[in-house]
Amino acid sequence: MFQTSLPLPSNDGENTIEIEVIEKTWKCPTCTPKEQHVLEELQKRTNIRDRNALAAIMGNIKQESGFKAKICEGGAKVPYKQCRYGGYGLIQWTTTNRYNNLGKFCKKYDCDPSTIEGQTRFMINESAFQRYLSEFENAGFSIEQYMVPSYYWLGWGIKGNRTHYAYQYAGKLVWTE
């Protein structure tokens, strides 16, 4: 739930009346705290409001890392600086540039590249995600249709169960204040 206070002019023209605006968001009561964090940040930091778009992103993250931040491709559970090859983290940043940019981002913005919080911040701000963000912000498409920008954002080699996971998330998301 996101709350905002908006000042409105009163009838006498001098005083203002504050009203509270409460925006509804998608919640996942049965999700893990890590999943809930990513879901909340995606809605807070972007204009993604479509259930299927959010579910597609969540399904992709589950396929890539199982929402484990300290995970190196192949399963080694290590901090950021100890992953020497393959992908790392939530979306398995694989290329040298993407991996290094995670570290640079967290150094610049004082976050830890080994945590869900640091990686979520980077993921949302990363140029690869930003390039396809508008496609996720356009509402009304199927999960399969949101898998197209997901593929270009992530560049996965193996599709795996990401679509299946996305449908599971879509079934668990609840529209609430």
Segments (PLM) and residue ranges:
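Short, functionally critical alpha-helical segments immediately adjacent to catalytic or ligand/cofactor-binding
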Residues: 51-68
